[in-house]
From Swiss-Prot:
Lineage: Eukaryota, Metazoa, Chordata, Craniata, Vertebrata
Pfam families in alphabetical order: Cys_knot (PF00007)
Name used for this protein in its record: Lutropin subunit beta
GO cellular component terms, semicolon-separated: cytoplasm; extracellular space
Cited CDD domains: GHB_like
Domain of life the protein comes from: Eukaryota
Disulfide bonds: 4-52, 18-67, 21-105, 29-83, 33-85, 88-95
Source organism per UniProt: Aquarana catesbeiana (American bullfrog)
Gene: lhb
Length: 112
């Protein structure tokens, strides 16, 4: 088991009206965070689950090839610069137990 840290991951980018899906590598946050669950729980007990999440991020942009005219061919994605354990921030994090793999493509796939 690894504590919260940066790791490379393959993700995918695709859009409507662009015929291909591009897979590429970026950095993500992954690993475990210590959580304490009280032995005695009451209705007033609060439970807070820490997750490994972004501390600092930047955004990079790639251009999807062969998009139809009038389609924005650019895809912007987060790049993790540092990670830490904190409460899940639903505005930019996937806090589900099981989500789809980050490199799922619905269209023809190419790698860069």
């Amino acid at each position: 088991r690894h504590v919260c840290h940066l790791a490379n991951a393959t993700i995918s980018a695709e859009k409507d009206h662009c015929p291909v899906c591009i897979t590429f590598t970026t950095s993500i946050c992954t690993g475990y965070c210590q959580t304490m669950d009280p032995v005695y729980k009451t209705a007033l007990s609060s439970f807070k689950q820490n997750i490994c999440t972004y501390k600092e991020i930047r955004y990079d942009t790639i251009k999807l090839p062969d998009c139809l005219p009038g389609t924005d061919p650019f895809f912007t994605y987060p790049v993790a610069l540092s990670c830490y354990c904190d409460l899940c921030k639903m505005d930019y994090s996937d806090c589900t137990v099981e989500s789809s793999e980050p490199d799922v493509c619905m269209k023809r796939r190419i790698s860069i």
